[in-house]
Amino acid sequence: MVWMKFLGVLLMSMGCFVIFRMNKHLLCLFVGLEMMSLGLLFVTHVFLMNQFWLILLILCLAVCEASICLALLVMVMRLCGDDLMSSLLSDGS
């Protein structure tokens, strides 16, 4: 069980690193969010082993977040032509 705690904390910290350091592309931000939600799932599994419904709820929320991120990525790609954060922040003039 100790390795699952370590893996959860490692995934959450790697997700934070990806979000704060590799934020040039929108896809990198979404991958960082997914890593953080996977780390949260591991940590929740360690601390709440008897509460299987809560683990399923967190997993369901992570899947919903991933589908919303994918829809946003497709929408941004259609509107701007790329997934660079600089193209989202420019005013277009």
UniProtKB/Swiss-Prot annotation:
Under the heading Pfam families, the entry gives: Oxidored_q2
Q: Name the principal localization, coarsely classed.
A: mitochondrion
Could you name the Gene Ontology cellular component terms for this entry?
Answer: mitochondrial membrane
Which EC number(s) does the record attach to this protein? Answer: 7.1.1.2
Keyword list (alphabetical) reads:
Electron transport, Membrane, Mitochondrion, NAD, Respiratory chain, Translocase, Transmembrane, Transmembrane helix, Transport, Ubiquinone
Q: Where in the cell is it found?
A: Mitochondrion membrane
> Could you state a single Gene Ontology molecular function term?
NADH dehydrogenase (ubiquinone) activity
Q: Which residues form a coiled coil?
A: none
Does this UniProt record's set of keywords contain Cell membrane?
Answer: no
- Enzyme kind, highest EC tier: translocase
Question: Which reactions is this enzyme annotated as catalysing?
Answer: a ubiquinone + NADH + 5 H(+)(in) = a ubiquinol + NAD(+) + 4 H(+)(out)
Q: How does it sit in the membrane?
A: Multi-pass membrane protein
- Keyword Ribonucleoprotein among UniProt keywords: no
Residue ranges annotated as transmembrane are 1-21, 29-49, 54-74
Known role: Core subunit of the mitochondrial membrane respiratory chain NADH dehydrogenase (Complex I) that is believed to belong to the minimal assembly required for catalysis. Complex I functions in the transfer of electrons from NADH to the respiratory chain. The immediate electron acceptor for the enzyme is believed to be ubiquinone.
Provide the family line.
Belongs to the complex I subunit 4L family.
What is the designated name of this protein?
A: NADH-ubiquinone oxidoreductase chain 4L
